[in-house]
Amino acid sequence: MTKNIGKITQIISAVVDVKFTNNGELPEILNALECYNDKQRIVLEVAQHIGDDTVRCIAMDSTEGLVRGVEVIDTGSPIRIPVGTETLGRIMNVVGEPIDGKGDIKSSNISSIYKSAPDFTNQSTERNILVTGIKVVDLLAPYTKGGKIGLFGGAGVGKTVLIMELINNVAKAHGGYTVFAGVGERTREGNDLYHEMIDSGVIDLEKPENSKVALVYGQMNEPPGARARVALSGLTIAESFRDMNEGQDVLFFVDNIFRFTQAGSEVSALLGRIPSAVGYQPTLATDMGELQERITSTKNGSITSVQAIYVPADDLTDPAPATSFAHLDATTVLSRQIAELGIYPAVDPLDSNSQVLDPMIVGEEHYSVARQVQQILQTYKSLQDIIAILGMDELSEEDKLTVSRARKIQRFLSQPFHVAEVFTGAEGKFVNLADTIAGFKGLVEGKYDDLPEAAFYMVGTMDEAIEKAKILKG
């Protein structure tokens, strides 16, 4: 079979035009083309057909130094990456090339990054709770095994720290495999995560086959083409683990889905498409749907996905975060107001929600305690204007008691994280679901009305709060 060879005719930033004149055959849309820039392989993805003989492509790598006239070869298929157990313990880029300096990834399984979502008949609808050990999450917005979870928050409120803690609490105790896709985030954070996983034994450098995680990075410094596709590359590896013979329960972490949308917007602008609301690409909902619909559980295995989602200017109605809401089973909203109070994780207990906070799934006691906690916090929120203007003394005795309990609940929702030990000096805590429910049940019933507020701040279980109260009382 003769190779379909073209030549570069135009380069504008990450957009490259290639002319095919040999036999008049144009590569299909989404096909991967290859060219070499000073011995470095560059992959181009076909985005548009222009006229009879030219295709417009998006580069998956920097185009600096690339010149017109360079030969381009059509690979005949979309971007294909190595999948399977050989990827464990390794870091690769969007096109499947290793970037950890440990040689090629020798995998017999190569897969296209574009696939259809599983058939309806194959999808599983079972609902089980995934215990994270984080009180505010487990009580008020519990996660589901095989569900899609979104962590929403503005800049600097703790999305990445929360994702790292979930990796620490869930992935390390988890029997199956984990895939982490770094989409347009800081290279330093990706490096920190890699070394942390080596230190904790999740990645075994001596015997990579014993590792439990595969990493796919397309960080902030990458061109928009790579950032727009790296989530699909990570998902392809997660799907391969899910569909293995014995079936696996796979954890799929993405940091950050907003950067996926942002990169799509950049690509769209480079291709000259007319923007839609707030300057986003007109295909925003389609792009998000194609990614999210593939993240699903089948009868063979499950993919539980945790996605950090940046909220521009703390506006949850921005089209990028708003489009992802529809796809999620649980949303954890991080609030700047709560972070300003020094309460971490800065999860908003009233904005966060979960489809599985249902008495049929979590049980009557859990549901009842969660709703009582939210009711007390909601009452406190509605009283804050009165307190700010008139002061606490003007409240009724009943309201004073509600405010006192709400402030204790607010502080008890804080928790020291394992991954933040180096910054806080406080030992990280993993709290079992039964202890979480029991602690908050006691609080709403007034069992701990005599304990000072400070005793509930940055502790794990209620027993620790009682011990702390004894120390505070001296």
From Swiss-Prot:
It catalyses: ATP + H2O + 4 H(+)(in) = ADP + phosphate + 5 H(+)(out). It is a peripheral membrane protein. InterPro entries: AAA+_ATPase, ATP-synt_VA_C, ATP_synth_F1_bsu, ATPase_a/bsu_AS, ATPase_alpha/beta_chains, ATPase_F1/V1/A1_a/bsu_N, ATPase_F1/V1/A1_a/bsu_N_sf, ATPase_F1/V1/A1_a/bsu_nucl-bd. Keywords: ATP synthesis, ATP-binding, Cell inner membrane, Cell membrane, CF(1), Hydrogen ion transport, Ion transport, Membrane, Nucleotide-binding, Translocase, Transport. It comes from the Bacteria. Gene3D superfamilies: 2.40.10.170, Bovine Mitochondrial F1-atpase, Atp Synthase Beta Chain, Chain D, domain 3 (1.10.1140.10), P-loop containing nucleotide triphosphate hydrolases (3.40.50.300). GO terms for cellular component: plasma membrane; proton-transporting ATP synthase complex. ATP binds at G153, G154, A155, G156, V157, G158, K159, T160. Its EC number is 7.1.2.2. It is found in: Cell inner membrane. The keyword Translocase applies. F-type ATPases have 2 components, CF(1) - the catalytic core - and CF(0) - the membrane proton channel. CF(1) has five subunits: alpha(3), beta(3), gamma(1), delta(1), epsilon(1). CF(0) has three main subunits: a(1), b(2) and c(9-12). The alpha and beta chains form an alternating ring which encloses part of the gamma chain. CF(1) is attached to CF(0) by a central stalk formed by the gamma and epsilon chains, while a peripheral stalk is formed by the delta and b chains. Produces ATP from ADP in the presence of a proton gradient across the membrane. The catalytic sites are hosted primarily by the beta subunits. Belongs to the ATPase alpha/beta chains family. This is ATP synthase subunit beta. It comes from Rickettsia felis (strain ATCC VR-1525 / URRWXCal2). The gene is atpD.
